[in-house]
Every structure is written in structure tokens, then in C-alpha cells.
Amino acid sequence: AEYDVSDADIEAFYQ
């Protein structure tokens, strides 16, 4: 994604 975190972490935030 567009952040410094991994896409897996971002998906966790969206869910």
C-alpha cells in the first residue's frame, strides 16, 4: 500500500 506498514497489517486495520 502507500504506507510504511505491510499490506497484511493494513488489511487488519480495514477489517
UniProtKB/Swiss-Prot annotation:
Keyword annotations from UniProtKB, A to Z: Cell cycle, Cell division
GO-annotated biological processes: cell division
Entry keyword Cell division: yes
Function text: Possible mediator for cell division in the blooming process.
Additional comment: On the 2D-gel the determined pI of this protein is: 6.0, its MW is: 21.5 kDa.
Protein name per the record: Preblooming protein 1
Organism: Prorocentrum triestinum
